[in-house]
Regions:
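Bacterial N-terminal signal peptides
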Residues: 1-5
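Short S/T/G/P-rich N-terminal loop/turn motif that feeds into the first structured element of a domain
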Residues: 10-222
Length: 222
């Protein structure tokens, strides 16, 4: 974990992401189980989003927990560790499993003004996952911050996360929209002759400091 992660952890919204894949014919059962889990997590201080992967992925489901800051995160985790509700939940879930977890990681928003409540409600999104070269974090963040207002002017809400436990060296560049129509309208403004196209052309010869490892869309289910 880089020093950037430590500096943002105390102040920005903290997220944990659990990626699940339903067993064949068990998608509805897995969603029902996630809804039950969400009600427990919310009582214990977390904000929960259940995100369905779309194009570019393999029908995975992200179970996302958010807290306002690291202190809220730690307090909630301590409650979970001694919760009888979780003992009972997992005893029931393990009797008839509906899916398997394929990955998990935590991440912090680079915008230290963001709170967990800023992510309530329904939305669709596009996310690009980047794996940064060692020692190039600040350079990559600078590029993200330069591109962010361009995409915002095209209609996207931009959130940038630095992953730590579970996915060190990863950055998740997330574009959020109210609907698929809004996503399409925004992306239609990024073609030839656009401000985005000019920016991409101006950076074409820049040093390669990160590799894009994933690019997919999705939407919330709760």
């Amino acid at each position: 974990m880089s020093f950037v992660s430590f500096s943002t952890m105390a102040y920005s919204d903290v997220a944990e992401v659990y990626q699940w894949e339903a067993f064949p014919g068990k998608s509805m059962e897995m969603m029902e189980s996630m809804m039950k889990a969400a009600s427990i997590h919310e009582k214990q201080g977390a904000t929960v989003a259940i995100d369905l992967h779309n194009i570019g992925s393999t029908q995975l489901v992200n179970y996302v927990l958010r807290w306002d800051d690291s202190k809220s995160y730690a307090a909630s985790k301590d409650i979970q560790a001694s919760s009888q509700e979780w003992v009972e939940f997992w005893a029931e879930a393990n009797q008839n499993p509906s899916g398997e977890m394929t990955a998990s990681f935590s991440a912090n928003n680079l915008d230290q003004t963001r709170k967990a409540s800023d992510f309530e409600g329904s939305y669709v999104y596009s996310v690009a996952v980047w794996d940064v070269e060692s020692g190039k974090d600040l350079d990559l963040i600078q590029r993200f911050m330069t591109s962010k207002p361009i995409l915002e002017r095209a209609g996207a809400r931009v959130e940038i996360y630095q992953a730590n436990w579970g996915a060190p060296g990863e950055y998740h560049y997330v574009l959020m929209f109210d609907s698929w129509a809004a996503l399409e309208e925004s992306f239609s403004k990024l073609g030839p002759g656009s401000e985005w196209a000019s920016y991409m052309q101006s950076t074409a010869d820049d040093e390669v400091i990160a590799e894009q490892t994933a690019f997919f869309t999705g939407q919330t289910a709760n």
